[in-house]
Every structure is written in structure tokens, then in C-alpha cells.
Amino acid sequence: IDKVKMLHDPTSPYAISASFAMGRAMDAEIYDAALGTAYTGKNGNNPIVLPNSQKLAADDKGFTFAKLKKLKRMFDSNDIEEHNRYILYTAAQLDDLLGEEKVTSADYNAVRALERGEINEYMGFKFIQLNGVRDTGKKIITADTVSGKTVRHCVAFATNCMKLGIGEDVKAEITPRADKNYSTQVYFEMAIGAARLEEEGVVQFDCVES
């Protein structure tokens, strides 16, 4: 009974670990849907890929101020709502931006990013750092190796152009496993899915990592 109670205690190690795991699963679902194939039509059998017009090449650079400006221009040109724009990136891209004077200087940015070592919101985007890994051991935000360099595929999107659906809320159980000498198994489950609704509100931007 005490173990079952721990599942519902938000401060318990079980609940905290499960919360992190579920959070990573939701992050991966949203990220994959943003860059993956969306399906339209009455029967959902019409595949739509993210067009090249919604992709920014790395150009052998990391996450620069110039690249951030291009992202803003793309969203503005597509008349995308200003108040719900997000950027998904990793610690490597944050490090790039913290080296950009216009991002860290108080003359340009009231947030004073360099003092805090983080960027929460800038140029109309809210920044979300995703460093979590998948079950495969690879990062949620995927990368390829190009000419010996790691190229990270980051994402900028507007919330009204993406959709996350929760088909089944979290189910939690603690049971002994007879095949494991009756050691305790903690089981969490939920059903989720995500889809890209409008290509104009999603941009893949690639960044070289040093």
C-alpha cells in the first residue's frame, strides 16, 4: 500500500522519475511530428512532408544571431501568430547564442542572458532546451554527420501549427515480477500522439556543433 501511495505522491522518487520519462516521451513525440510526415484527407492517407522552403541549412555555422533573424523573418512573412512561437534546441546551440554579443548585451537584450547563462525568450521566441535522450540512447533532437561534422536538426514552431493529443492519461502500477525473483516493477503508461497542422508555422533549422 505504501508503494502504491508513492505513485501518487508528486515528490516521491517513483513519481519524479516517471514524470521525467513521460516528459521526454512527449518532447520526442512533438519533435518527431514537427519534422516528420503529416497525413491529411478524409482517410488520413495523403502524406505531406515538411517542404524545403521551411528548412534553414546549417551553412557550416552553429546557431547564430543571423540565423535567428532569418527564423523570425520566415514566421513574420508567413503571418504566423507572434505570441506562441517556440524554439527547440540543445545545450550546444545555447552555447552558440551566449557567444553572440547582440543576444547577451544589455544594449540589445533586457533579459541579460549572459548573466543568467540561459535564454528564456528573445526576438519573439520562447526557448526550450531539450537534452534528453531516447530509448535508443540518441538525443531527442536528432543529428547527422556531414563531412565529419555533427549537424543538429533544431525546430522552431508556433503552437497553433502543431497539435498534441492525449488519448489515455497516465496509468501507473507497482507489481512484483515472478521472473525477476519477485523484484518490484514500476509501470507507467500513457497514449499520446502529435501532428503538424500547418507547414508555414514549422521550420527546421540546422546547426553545426563544434
What do these predicted regions represent?
Residues I1-N43, D76-A91, F127, A172-R196:
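Long, contiguous amphipathic alpha-helices that act as assembly "spine/axial" helices in icosahedral shell
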Residues K5, P51, K55-F63, E100-S210:
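Sequence/fold signature of self-assembling virion shell proteins
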Residues G36, A92-D96, V133-D135:
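Short, catalytically relevant binding-site loops at active-site mouths
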Residues K42-E115:
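Extended, solvent-exposed, turn-rich assembly/linker loops in the middle of proteins
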